Amino acid sequence: MSELFKLTLSDITAKLKAREVSAVELATEGLALCEAAQPKLNAFTAFDADKTLAMAKASDEKLARGEGGLIEGAPLAIKDLFAVEGVETAASSNILKGFKPTYESSVTAKLWENGGVFLCKTSMDEFAMGSSNETSNTGPVNNPWKGANGEMLTPGGSSGGSAAAVAADLCFGATGTDTGGSIRQPAAFTGTVGVKATYGRTSRWGAVAFASSLDHPGPFAKTVKDSALMLQAMSGHDPKDSTSLPNDVPDFVAAVGQSVKGLRIGVPKEYRVDGMPAEIDEAWQKGIDWLKAAGCEIVDISLPHTKYALPAYYIVAPAEASSNLARYDGMRYGNRVEGTNLNATYENTRGAGFGHEVQRRIMIGTYVLSAGYYDAYYLRAQKVRTRILQDFEQAFEKVDAVLTPSAPSAAFALGSKSDDPIAMYLNDVFTVTANLAGLPAMSVPAGVDKDGLPLGLQIITPALDEETMFKVGAAIEDSAGFVAKPENWWA
């Protein structure tokens, strides 16, 4: 393993600007590392070495002229949900297998404008539907961290490939999407930092849609500062996305390391759920103690509609998915399975193209939107969503940020929950509220459990206040002193 790839994004960009290392050298090494790790981690879905080296060469030319963007020359991994021009973008689904977009997603375009270098596409749960990266058409991704007895663990989902790539030091940052926790839960499971900004802060244009009102593109990184750097490079108004915010992007990096003294931190009683492992509760209490020691005021708060968040989410998200995924019929792009007539072709194509979990969610979504059940399910879920947002708005009149666990457990063994959808869905219990309310949230490594596996803490802040999120995240990072790394078994 190269020592260079153990560096942070901030450190490597400084070395690139100082001409201590070349972007081409980094890109070449990154490709070799990823290809060597692929047979064991199974984290990647596509490479384009020519594209990678051409982008790296262009970065070197800019740096030689004393130019360059925020992350000039840094190799990045891209979740297989974002269109990268000329590179297969399949959302880890058979129905899009072989699809190579002729356009660039807005998020990746911004990363390239800021100097990022495309390294690879990363595996994910099919169409971002899953919490363990086991529904991918290329098979499960293995977490770089192993269980106490050496068993393979999930990296979380749906952005498990990106989380695994960052945790294994195979790239300097990665993109993910977070619809109900798909950045924050994998970050917690892999000991990385994962960020979901305010809804609309990062553009959804060119990213395959799951649930349009809940989808949040965001970054994975090794440190809070790196995540701020990545989000800075990804954010900004996009006229192609009607939900994109027109607001100026603050200096997220400048917020990292600022004092948290005097900030009021809310601790919601509703997040102390039944059956939560003692280690999760202990990590949460440590986070509270760290922030208190840093000069924060700890305030007990109530978010009374939290108990309805998970069922509301699993009505709203499948409903939007059933609508979004109606466009995949094999007619103009992707795989087509011919039938004896048009309807048979549609049925064959969608039946063969979509995996079981995607089919399950499409059926749930179609059911809750049907004439006899719309009011009973979908409409009520939207009312709950409004109540959840109101709970947060009332809480933020008293506090500046909310602190909770990121996930109800450490990473679990692959296959241990794949036959129990309810147990799988419960992984999102701490994260879905921020999606339903459209609020910024991040997961920061806060320690390890008895088996040495990472645990994460979640910070939620008011809309458009990512700066406070980064301040609090950096304070936890400093206090936790998390430096644990998985033993390298994949090289």
UniProtKB/Swiss-Prot annotation:
Q: What is its EC number?
A: 6.3.5.7
Question: Got a GO cellular component term for this one?
Answer: glutamyl-tRNA(Gln) amidotransferase complex
Which domain of life does the UniProt lineage start with? Bacteria
Active site positions: 79 (charge relay system), 158 (charge relay system), 182 (acyl-ester intermediate)
UniProt key word Ligase:
yes
Which reactions does this protein catalyse? L-glutamyl-tRNA(Gln) + L-glutamine + ATP + H2O = L-glutaminyl-tRNA(Gln) + L-glutamate + ADP + phosphate + H(+)
Q: Which GO terms describe its molecular function?
A: ATP binding; glutaminyl-tRNA synthase (glutamine-hydrolyzing) activity
Database matches in InterPro entries: Amidase, Amidase_CS, Amidase_dom, AS_sf, GatA
Note the SUPFAM superfamilies from the entry.
Answer: Amidase signature (AS) enzymes
Alphabetical keyword list:
ATP-binding, Ligase, Nucleotide-binding, Protein biosynthesis
- Give the GO biological process terms: translation
Assembly and interaction partners: Heterotrimer of A, B and C subunits.
Q: Please state which protein family the record places this protein in.
A: Belongs to the amidase family. GatA subfamily.
Summarize the protein's role: Allows the formation of correctly charged Gln-tRNA(Gln) through the transamidation of misacylated Glu-tRNA(Gln) in organisms which lack glutaminyl-tRNA synthetase. The reaction takes place in the presence of glutamine and ATP through an activated gamma-phospho-Glu-tRNA(Gln).
Cross-referenced NCBIfam families: gatA
Q: What is this protein called?
A: Glutamyl-tRNA(Gln) amidotransferase subunit A
Q: Which gene encodes it?
A: gatA
